[in-house]
Amino acid sequence: SAASDVYKRQLYHMYDSRVEAIEFFVSENSNVTDIPLRDLKLKKHLLICFINRNGKIIIPTGNDCIQKNDTVMIITTHTGFTNLQDIME
């Protein structure tokens, strides 16, 4: 399933666990890949900080897309994210 194809690698709790920074590895294409970030229906209170693509750090704009084999770092005030699909509304 797509949910298991994008998995959490690292989780950081900050500010008394009010903020989480979560690193995801994108092992397969999913409903968040190959779509410009501006077109994704992301939850509020969430920021895609960077995309690591083959060792190159991308500070994303709305024109960037998440691709298979990327590592994506998000920061959010939400809790309980288990996969990258959880960033969607």
Set out the residue ranges of the language-model regions:
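Short, small-residue-biased leader/transition segments that mark boundaries at the very start
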Residues: 2-7
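Glycine-rich, charged/polar anion/phosphate-binding loops
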Residues: 8-10, 34-35
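Internal, active-site/partner-interface "lid" segment
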Residues: 9-27
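Cytosolic Rossmann-like ligand/nucleotide-binding regulatory domains
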Residues: 23-89
